[in-house]
């Protein structure tokens, strides 16, 4: 059976991105790097982030990421949301809205507490709407505020 592996095309910052991702997320490692020449920049790589295998390539300045593709980080709780969010911001990431943040390499991440997914899975549409409305006002997701919106609906 064929296996699907995300292939990330960076303009020229593949090695720096991999170093950051491996240092930031557990269960991460560099598996292979291919350089342009013996001491040249990394051309391609195989790496694991959070247990997920990725392939990467430095493809030149005409390649860039968009929000059309993002990496979703399923966080156990608010503490984990804060940990990853803070690491991304400290590295120069740009927070956007609704738990989304663009890293310094242009890749967009969704840092989402598992509780959010549980709350929007409720069978009561009023509660789901209240949680979604609250989420739409947030930059970094806040579990306590989401639960408050749910409880007050």
Tell where the protein language model's regions lie, with residue ranges:
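Acidic/histidine-enriched, glycine/proline-rich intrinsically disordered or flexible terminal extensions
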Residues: 127-153
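Terminal peptide-recognition signature
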Residues: 6, 21, 47, 88, ...
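Core segments of cupin and vicinal oxygen chelate
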Residues: 8-52
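Serine endopeptidase catalytic core focused on the charge-relay Asp
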Residues: 18, 44, 48-50, 57, ...
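Vicinal oxygen chelate
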Residues: 14, 71-108, 112-115, 122, ...
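Active-site-proximal beta-strands of protease catalytic cores
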Residues: 24, 29, 53-55, 107-115
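A structural signal for short, well-ordered beta-strand segments
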Residues: 6-8, 71
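A short acidic/small-residue loop/turn micro-motif
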Residues: 61-62, 115-118
């Amino acid at each position: 059976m064929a296996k699907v592996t995300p292939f990330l095309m960076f303009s020229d910052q593949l090695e720096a991105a991999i170093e950051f991702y491996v240092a930031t997320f557990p269960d991460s490692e560099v598996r292979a790097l291919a350089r342009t020449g013996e001491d040249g920049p990394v051309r391609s790589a195989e790496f694991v982030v959070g247990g997920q295998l990725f392939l990467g390539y430095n493809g030149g300045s005409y390649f860039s990421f968009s929000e059309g593709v993002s990496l979703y980080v399923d966080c156990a709780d608010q503490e984990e949301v804060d940990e990853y969010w803070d690491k991304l911001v400290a590295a120069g990431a740009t927070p956007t809205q609704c738990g989304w943040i663009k890293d310094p390499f242009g890749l967009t991440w969704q840092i989402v507490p598992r509780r959010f997914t549980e709350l929007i899975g409720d069978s009561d549409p009023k509660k789901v709407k209240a949680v979604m409305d609250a989420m739409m006002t947030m930059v970094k997701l806040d579990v306590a505020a989401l639960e408050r919106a749910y409880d007050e609906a």
